UniProtKB/Swiss-Prot annotation:
Keywords: Membrane, Transmembrane, Transmembrane helix. This is Putative membrane protein ORF19. The chain crosses the membrane at residues 4-22, 90-106. The keyword Glycosyltransferase does not apply. GO terms for cellular component: membrane. It comes from the Viruses. It is a multi-pass membrane protein. It is found in: Membrane. It comes from Ictalurid herpesvirus 1 (strain Auburn).
Amino acid sequence: METMGPMVKSIWFWVIVLLVSGEGTDAVEIYWLELHESAVPCYGSKNTTMGDCLLAGGILGLCGFEMLHRDTPLRRGVINKVSYRAVPRFMVFLSVMVTILHVLIITACLTIYIIAKVRSRCRRPIERTPDKPDPERVRLYLDSVRRRYWPCSGTEGDEDRTRLMPPGDRVEYDGREKLVRFSDVVTTHLLTDPGDGTYTIANE
């Protein structure tokens, strides 16, 4: 952790050096050393780690620089000078733009995926609670429907056939409970009020 600060500073420094050198310089010389645990030449100091080496080398490659005389043996115990060849400015610009484009595409895909996941979890079915109708108006409507479609329904006592059932009552039709939707009111005679703000129509 103690080497993170110097490492970050050195990385930014060399990125600037490499980009500036790509403006027109054919080659840039960077001082590298050979780590004790690896034979890979790497820029750094006495506190340089293998991770620092790989990170700096990756930045060099992304910026379009390649090492000259890669197979030249390095001397141990001293800081060796290694030459890097800079690619033309257009190639550096092109590689940077392609990298940025890839990052933007990946970011956009991840953003769309996260938004879709959040919306799917937050989506709730819209429940509409119908307004509770006036029982007297409903009874009058059912009476008018019955008189219209069943004009010869019977005697005067049949007027009581259209009535409001108390909450909790059940109506049996042909030996079993018969419940239909309120939209089927034309074919019904009995209205059940369950007491929850909605009405259930039942055939008699």
